[in-house]
From Swiss-Prot:
Its EC number is 3.6.1.1. InterPro entries: Pyrophosphatase (IPR008162), Pyrophosphatase_sf (IPR036649). Mg(2+) 1 binds at residues 62, 67, 99. Keywords: Cytoplasm, Hydrolase, Magnesium, Metal-binding. This is Inorganic pyrophosphatase. The gene is ppa.
Length: 172
């Protein structure tokens, strides 16, 4: 993939959208074939509360790129890229290990709606509750799968995680 993490990373990063807001289909980008594929349809009667994707040119310890939930009022097509500002991180584990999610908003030039959101503490509690609820329950009906949320981190923790994931990818 030619898309980089972003020229201003970690302050502004590129996110490749895999799953649009409102979707109950889990899409995943297949790096070898360079296409977005259907991974599965969610077993629960839930939909993704916001757009979901990853930062290209990053690598987590589990071998996957760093996941991002993009807070937005509009669904974005799978396979599109958007420039975002990280505002925090959701710490969680699933059946495969640690699986943190960066929480981000579109950069102001893309969508000024969230220009006043600079850190996770600025995000309304109702939005954080919606995110928590989704990730706590979206795998419940899938055999052998589970999720445990351990808390939130602020913008500085998110940026540190992004820098670590970029360094890990570059040293690979």
């Amino acid at each position: 993939m030619k898309l980089s993490p972003g020229k201003k990373a970690p302050d502004e990063v590129n996110v490749l959208i895999e799953i649009p807001l409102g979707s109950n289909i889990k899409y995943e980008y297949d790096e070898e074939e360079e296409v977005v594929k259907v991974d599965r349809i969610l077993y629960t009667s839930m939909v993704y509360p916001f757009n979901y994707g990853f930062i290209p040119g990053t690598l987590e310890e589990d071998g996957d790129p760093l996941d991002v939930l993009v807070i937005s009022n509009y669904p974005l097509l799978p396979g599109t890229a958007i420039e975002v500002r990280p505002i925090g991180i959701l710490y969680m584990r699933d059946e495969e290990g640690e699986d943190a999610k960066i929480i981000a908003v579109p950069k102001d030039k893309v969508d000024p709606t969230f220009s006043n959101i600079k850190d996770i503490i600025d995000l309304p509690q109702a939005i954080k509750d919606k995110i928590n609820h989704f990730f706590e329950h979206y795998k419940e009906l899938e055999p052998g799968k589970w999720v445990k949320i351990s808390g939130w981190g602020g913008v500085s923790e998110a940026k540190t995680r992004i820098n670590e994931a970029i360094k890990r990818a570059n040293s690979k």
